[in-house]
């Protein structure tokens, strides 16, 4: 977890072939870890945006006790450029693979654990505005947040946590419900809590999930124990007519 200064990008001895090509970087696999190499236009440290990115990523790399954030490790620079950084390999899949057999209780546990790590980001005055489906991975037991390139300094610690928490919450609810519209429920309590979360007035994410499960169970007169149970009830249009 350090800044490593090299003379040029050749010193990194990158593999001949990249593993992935993203819009602003290339990903390589080397020695059991990923190397993310920034595009040339995003490297110059004389550019304030690139310099700030280096500073934020350095601060993130120094965080301790993190389990569910795939943070940068070594940051590689030259005299004039921020070349990129190494990062651990995460074997999770996108949240689209959130299977129907997973229990609601496990979803709640995974969300709570990831939120604890997200709170550690906000506590050091950093906001990650890039929490979306491609950056949250799932491996049956845990959720992981990846890709911190767009993180910024943010003075309001409480607001930073609410912004990140709301983004994660909406993503999880969307995947749990398989994109079914919550308006189908037409429930005052559900709509009220959802609105407060979206307006950054509340962090009742877990309470919402539990209430949603309870409301669907009452409406369907069935036990709602898994993601599949919830989706099956939502597919039953007769319940919502």
Predicted regions and their residues:
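Residue-level signal for tight coil/turn positions that link beta-strands
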Residues: 31-32, 133, 140-141
């Amino acid at each position: 977890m350090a800044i490593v200064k090299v003379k040029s990008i050749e010193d990194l001895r990158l593999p001949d072939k990249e593993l992935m090509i993203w819009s602003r970087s290339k990903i390589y696999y080397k020695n059991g870890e990923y190397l993310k190499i920034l595009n040339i236009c995003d490297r110059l440290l004389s550019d304030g945006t690139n310099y700030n990115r280096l500073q934020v990523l350095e601060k993130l790399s120094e965080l301790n006790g993190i389990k569910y954030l795939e943070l940068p490790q070594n940051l590689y620079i030259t005299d004039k450029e921020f070349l990129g950084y190494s990062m651990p390999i995460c074997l999770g899949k996108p949240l689209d693979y959130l299977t129907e057999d997973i229990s609601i209780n496990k979803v709640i546990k995974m969300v709570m654990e990831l939120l604890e790590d997200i709170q550690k980001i906000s506590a050091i005055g950093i906001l990650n505005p890039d929490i979306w489906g491609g950056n949250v991975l799932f491996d049956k037991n845990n959720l992981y947040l990846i890709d911190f390139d767009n993180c910024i300094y943010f003075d309001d610690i409480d607001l930073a946590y609410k912004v990140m928490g709301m983004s994660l919450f909406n993503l999880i609810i969307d995947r749990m419900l398989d994109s079914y519209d919550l308006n189908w429920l037409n429930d005052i309590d559900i709509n009220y809590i959802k609105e407060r979360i979206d307006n950054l007035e509340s962090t009742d994410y877990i309470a919402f999930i539990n209430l949603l499960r309870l409301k669907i169970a009452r409406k369907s007169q069935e036990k709602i124990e898994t993601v599949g149970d919830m989706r099956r009830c939502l597919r039953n249009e007769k319940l919502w007519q």
